[in-house]
């Protein structure tokens, strides 16, 4: 368990951030009584050259298995990075939108009776960055630096290669902050 230095009020419960992509990052944060801790994080790398439906299914299956031990109550919020055009690659945009559309029902179905659509938030990358105090156009290195600054553990330091995990941490935190940011 890694304690995080957070200066804003945050929702109590389990906060899960999912940065969906060909290499999806996830972060699971527990918050209670002013203690906020990163309890699990990682990335799931799916073969880009396999059939797209198989990639969608495998990503959903692996994410459901990964978050399974942490979904124990209805007090869970899953924040997913919303699709955005980025450098405008239509194939990438199409895959990301289908992945989001596949993941949410897969998770709800796996945790029927615990989770509903109300346990999910979709945030654009710029919005999630603004919610944690970064600029909306912050680059990958800025995100990594932010996460390294809030980690209260000198033995753990994320590198640029871990940007998908850091984005997932930012998404989980942004979802848990009560204050919303104006539209980007």
Positions of PLM-derived features:
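Phosphate- and other anionic-substrate recognition elements at nucleic-acid/protein interfaces
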Residues: 1-184
